[in-house]
A protein has these predicted regions:
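Short C-terminal tail/terminal secondary-structure segment
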Residues: 236-260
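Short, flexible catalytic-loop segment of classical short-chain dehydrogenase/reductase
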Residues: 182-193
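Rossmann-fold cofactor-recognition segment
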Residues: 35-50
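C-terminal helical subdomain
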Residues: 93, 149-154, 158-161, 180, ...
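N-terminal Rossmann NAD(P)H-binding glycine-rich loop of SDR-like oxidoreductase domains
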Residues: 12, 16-21
C-alpha cells in the first residue's frame, strides 16, 4: 500500500491507539473512530449510530478508503450483550458499510481482529460461531447476551475469523484483501483490570506463552501494518496468530490441515 487513508476503530486506547501511531509513523492518514477523542465519535454497540459513523468516515475520506482496521472491542468486565453488539455485529456493520469506499481505494486491505481465545476456550463450538454469522443481532443477544457464560467473546472472535476465510475470495474480486490477526494476551488497559478478578487472574496465569511474557500493543500494530502493506499483497484470507507461540504450543498439528 502506498501512503493512504486508513480507518481504525478503537483508537482511544490499546491496540487501536498503537495501530494509529504505527500507521501515522509510516505516513498514512488515519481516520480514528471511538466513543470519544477521535475523528469520528460514536458507539458501535448502538444500531442507530452505526450508519452515521459510516457516513462520517466516508465524508472524511472523500469516498475512497485504502484500508480498514476495526480494532474497537470489549472484554470483561463488559456485559455479554455488549460483547455481542460491539465485537461482532457493530464491527461487521462498519466493515460492510465501508466496503463501497474501500472499492474506490488504492490496493485496499482490511485487517480484522480475532483472538487466540478462539482455539483455547473449553466449551466453544463451531456452532457458536456459525450462530453469530447466520443469526440476526437480536437473536444472538437473546441467546448469549445474558448470564455469566464466557462464550460470547471467543464465539464472536471465531465468527470474525470464519468470516475472513469465507469472504476473502468474494472481496478479492472487488480488489480488497481480507486478513485478520489473532492476538494472544496483550498488556492493555482492557486486559490489566482482569488481574483484579481472582478467577480471571488465575486463567491468565495458566495460559502458556513460549515467548515468556505478555504481548505489547505495538507488536500487534506492527503485524497489522504489515498485512495492510504492499509487502503482504499475496496474503489473502489468513488469520495470523500473534500470541507469543501459544497457539502453536497447544495445537502443533492443526495447521495446515490436509483436505479430507
Amino acid at each position: 500500500m502506498n501512503m493512504g487513508t486508513i480507518c481504525v476503530t478503537g483508537t482511544a486506547s490499546g491496540i487501536g491507539a498503537a495501530t494509529k501511531v504505527k500507521l501515522e509513523s509510516l505516513g498514512h492518514k488515519v481516520i480514528g473512530v471511538d466513543l470519544r477523542n477521535a475523528d469520528v465519535c460514536g458507539d458501535i454497540s448502538k444500531v442507530a449510530e452505526r450508519q452515521r459513523i459510516v457516513d462520517e468516515v466516508i465524508a472524511l475520506c472523500g469516498g475512497a478508503l485504502d484500508g480498514l482496521v476495526p480494532c474497537a472491542g470489549v472484554s470483561n468486565p463488559a456485559s455479554n450483550e455488549l460483547k455481542v453488539r460491539v465485537n461482532f455485529y457493530g464491527t461487521m456493520a462498519l466493515v460492510n458499510g465501508l466496503r463501497s469506499a474501500l472499492e474506490k481505494g488504492v490496493d485496499p486491505a482490511v485487517v480484522m481482529i480475532s483472538s487466540n481465545s478462539t482455539t483455547m476456550t473449553p466449551g466453544l463450538s463451531i456452532e457458536d460461531a456459525l450462530g453469530f454469522l447466520n443469526d440476526d443481532e437480536e437473536t444472538t443477544v437473546a441467546k448469549y447476551g445474558v448470564g455469566d457464560t464466557y462464550i460470547p467473546y471467543p464465539a464472536g472472535k471465531l465468527a470474525i475469523a470464519f468470516w475472513v476465510r469465507m469472504k476473502s475470495n468474494e472481496w478479492m474480486q472487488s480488489g480488497i484483501r481480507l486478513n485478520a490477526v489473532a492476538p494472544g494476551v496483550i498488556d492493555t488497559a482492557m486486559t490489566r483490570p482482569l488481574l483484579d478478578v481472582p478467577v480471571m487472574a488465575e486463567r491468565l496465569k495458566m495460559i502458556p506463552i513460549p515467548r515468556g511474557r505478555w504481548g505489547r500493543a505495538d507488536e500487534i500494530a506492527s503485524a497489522i501494518a504489515f498485512l495492510l502493506s504492499s509487502e503482504a499483497s499475496f496474503i489473502v484470507g489468513q488469520v495470523l496468530f500473534v500470541d507469543g507461540g501459544t497457539d502453536a504450543l497447544l495445537q502443533p498439528t492443526v495447521h495446515p490441515h490436509p483436505l479430507p
